[in-house]
């Protein structure tokens, strides 16, 4: 598991889209959290399905009290996105020591 993303999942906190590299990977919104449910259960799959429907612009969902689920156009694209997400989560947590991360400028999250 990705340790920094897992911290967000354990806290049931979405990961804000503040890291510029996420934009380059196509992420333009916060990574949502799916409430905890036993893996493979109907509640789990329904929760993931609802999150994907509600947050169609997100390439990942955080699994409450568990970890992260990443999507991509290919396994390699998903793996690269996971690395970028983990970097973003680590940077967000480190930024807390400096007063917290700042949002990107207005319009930065708009589709180009």
Specify the residue positions occupied by each region the protein language model found.
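Glycine-rich flexible loops
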Residues: 2-112
């Amino acid at each position: 598991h990705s340790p920094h993303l897992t911290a967000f999942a354990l806290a049931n906190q979405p990961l804000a889209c503040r890291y510029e590299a996420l934009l380059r990977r196509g992420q333009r919104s916060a990574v949502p959290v799916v409430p905890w449910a036993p893996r493979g259960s109907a509640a789990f799959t329904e929760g993931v399905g609802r999150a994907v429907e509600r947050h169609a612009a997100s390439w990942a969902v955080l699994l409450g009290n568990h970890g992260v689920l990443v999507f991509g156009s290919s396994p390699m694209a998903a793996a690269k996105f996971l690395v970028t997400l983990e970097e973003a989560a680590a940077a967000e947590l480190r930024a807390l020591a400096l007063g917290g991360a700042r949002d990107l400028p207005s319009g930065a999250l708009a589709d180009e």
